[in-house]
Design a protein with these regions (language model features):
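Helix-turn-helix
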Residues: 31, 35, 39-73, 77
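Solvent-exposed, amphipathic alpha-helical segments
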Residues: 35-42, 85-96, 175-182
Length: 214
């Protein structure tokens, strides 16, 4: 009987440890991503080395490799958080918004610029070509639905157009991206002599969608 009890206790302890390990792994994985999110917000993309992320997370320099086989995997996990944040902000301004498609698209574009200017480090990381091209962790699966929201709104504003809505939406997005970057660098405020980005936003929409009906 004593031997049986000992074996039972040992088996129970092993099972308990096995159950704890995935939880601990998930917790450390999340801690590494959170450290990266905080680091990119504070110091920018250039600070996101594996060594620095590990230091911020309070783990050994080799720990990230256990959960993220490559640097791109970890950067992609951090970028996914950025896309999730942008998607949440987009949903917040569009859900329950009963305005016209043009008004909804204006709100979407404004949200995009606000995100780019308030989170410049994350914004730069999210649209890095190497991350999107590699599609680590299905990163494109989190970014493309946001673009589709833009395409759908363009299609409602200009239902019969050539080029098609996806091309118009792509040109509009490219224009907004350029405005965000040049404004963030200080080039556009200097060139326009204004600290108000709203006229540029409206001019961009007019250029791609036509003047708004008054």
């Amino acid at each position: 009987m004593p031997a049986s009890t000992s074996t039972s206790t040992s088996t129970s302890s092993s099972a308990h440890s096995a159950n704890e390990e995935p939880t601990q792994d998930a917790g450390l994985r999340a801690r590494l991503v959170e450290a990266g999110v905080e680091l990119v917000a504070r110091e920018g993309v250039q600070a996101l080395s594996l060594r620095e992320i590990a230091r911020q997370a309070g783990v050994s320099h080799g720990a990230p490799r256990r959960y993220f086989p490559t640097h791109l995997d970890l950067l992609s996990a951090i970028a996914r958080r950025g896309f999730a944040d942008l998607a949440a902000r987009t949903a917040e301004v569009l859900d329950g918004n009963d305005g016209s498609p043009r008004a909804r698209l204006t709100s979407l574009a404004r949200t995009y610029l606000d995100f780019a200017l308030s989170e410049p480090g994350m914004y730069e990381l999210m649209f890095r070509h190497d991350l999107l091209e590699s599609n680590r962790l299905g990163l494109r699966d989190t970014s493309l639905p946001l673009f589709q929201v833009l395409v759908d709104l363009v299609a409602r504003i200009r239902p019969s157009t050539d080029p098609p809505p996806s091309v118009v939406a792509g040109a509009l997005w490219g224009n907004l991206h350029g405005v965000a970057q040049l404004w963030g660098w200080g080039s556009l405020p200097l060139a326009t002599g204004s600290d108000d980005i709203e006229p540029l936003l409206r001019a961009t929409l007019d250029a791609h969608l036509g003047p708004e009906a008054r």
